[in-house]
């Protein structure tokens, strides 16, 4: 009898002990990347799990080519991960409209999230007046150049269209391509260039007016911007020598070309900082960055196009909403963790838009990236920013702006007709309440 009783008590102690120390799982579906995955496992998943005793974060990696569709399928079935990661606001809008995401207003108020984030970035996750997404990373488009090459030849880094076309001629005379970039493997690369020309020819104010419906996309200033892009792409071959070459090369190719002086410059997003540093660093040359050149007097000088790279939301059907909220709040409450992870990518990934001071940037970060971060904060802080298409364009016109651009470049449709179709898609999106949040301009 005593033996039985002791056995019962001992079993009860084990059960109580196990219950006290067991954790509830929190799942997060994340895009896989061979270089990034180990860092996210160590510095995000494992760090969070070690920091508290209530929840066990499990990051589930999958290539975006299949993840986006499998995520949509599971969400439609009332399943899916607790933390929903999307490629941007247009995806958030789709899930929010379908009632698949948790309203985060009460949590934002409780934990003070609005006071921790850059204002425009916080507003990018507000749909129909409520918060549904937090940016996992924010980014911009910049111009990179081979600083060593420019100094050797006495070339001036272009800040205007005239200066760009002048240095382009000098670069081509040396047998090099002006810009390297390409869309092989990722057709939406086209929208990077379209956005550059819309914002830096027509200007951010004009783009903003079109986004909110106060100006038509058929306005001559937008037509002129895309006519200039077509001229530079097709007639003058500023990107990799020709349109055909641009279509033929991808990420590894254009980084290699930039690193080996095959091209003097590259227009690309800030997500490239790590790859560029590693690539050109091996050649012995030094790289520099600059804001994209102003392409007309209407652009009102240099600006940084703002964008959200990926977003974090909570599944409305999550098995562990409390745990998912705890993960998000832990990220936003631990600036050092965010900076440490972002530093591993030279601030090209996991750039959660927390309010940072210049003193927050680690000394280990390259001087080029440090300079960019400070200049970006200064210029965007003054309200001088443009708009990337993948963050502020609704779904249908957002696809049209890159997918059908090849038809324009092939000469099968005029820029005027293309923009006429584009305006009709915006009208349709506005009528169906599919437009995305956009920060107000002063």
Give the location of each predicted region.
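A structural signal for short loop-to-beta-strand junctions that line the ligand-binding cleft
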Residues: 81-82, 113-149, 177-183, 192, ...
């Amino acid at each position: 009898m005593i033996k039985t009783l002791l056995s019962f008590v001992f079993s009860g102690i084990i059960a109580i002990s196990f219950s006290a120390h067991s954790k509830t799982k929190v799942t997060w579906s994340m895009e896989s990347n061979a270089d990034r995955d180990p860092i996210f496992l160590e510095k995000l998943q494992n760090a969070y799990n070690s920091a508290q005793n209530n929840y066990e974060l499990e990051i589930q990696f999958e290539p975006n080519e299949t993840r986006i569709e499998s995520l949509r399928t599971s969400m439609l079935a009332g399943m899916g991960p607790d933390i929903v990661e999307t490629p941007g606001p247009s995806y958030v809008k789709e899930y929010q409209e379908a009632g698949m995401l948790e309203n985060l207003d009460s949590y934002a108020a409780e934990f003070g999230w609005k006071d921790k984030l850059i204002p425009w970035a916080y507003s990018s996750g507000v749909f129909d007046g409520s918060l549904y997404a937090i940016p996992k990373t924010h980014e911009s488009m910049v111009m990179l150049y081979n600083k060593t090459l420019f100094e050797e030849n006495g070339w001036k880094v272009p800040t205007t269209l005239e200066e760009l076309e002048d240095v382009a001629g000098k670069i081509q005379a040396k047998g090099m391509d002006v810009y390297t970039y390409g869309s092989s493997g990722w057709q939406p690369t086209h929208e990077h260039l379209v956005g550059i020309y819309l914002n830096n020819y027509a200007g951010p104010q004009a783009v903003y007016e079109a986004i909110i419906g106060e100006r038509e996309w058929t306005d001559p200033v937008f037509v002129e911007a895309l006519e200039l892009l077509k001229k530079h792409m097709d007639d003058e071959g500023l990107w990799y020598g020709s349109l055909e070459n641009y279509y033929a090369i991808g990420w590894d190719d254009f980084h290699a070309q930039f690193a080996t002086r095959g091209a003097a410059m590259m227009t690309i997003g800030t997500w490239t900082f790590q790859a560029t540093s590693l690539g050109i660093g091996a050649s012995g040359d030094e790289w520099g960055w600059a804001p994209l050149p102003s392409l007309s007097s209407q652009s009102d000088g240099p600006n940084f196009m703002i964008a959200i790279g990926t977003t974090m939301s909570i599944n409305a059907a999550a098995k562990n909403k409390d745990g998912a909220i705890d993960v998000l709040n832990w990220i936003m409450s631990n600036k050092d963790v965010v900076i440490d992870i972002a530093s591993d990518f030279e601030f090209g990934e996991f750039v959660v838009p927390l309010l940072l001071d210049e003193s927050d940037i680690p000394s280990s970060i390259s001087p080029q990236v440090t300079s960019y971060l400070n200049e970006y904060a200064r210029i965007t802080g003054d309200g001088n920013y443009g708009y990337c298409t993948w963050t502020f364009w609704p779904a249908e016109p957002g696809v049209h702006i890159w997918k059908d651009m090849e038809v324009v470049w092939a000469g099968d449709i005029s820029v005027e007709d293309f923009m006429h179709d584009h305006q009709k898609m915006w009208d349709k999106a506005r009528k169906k309440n599919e437009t995305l949040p956009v920060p107000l301009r002063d």
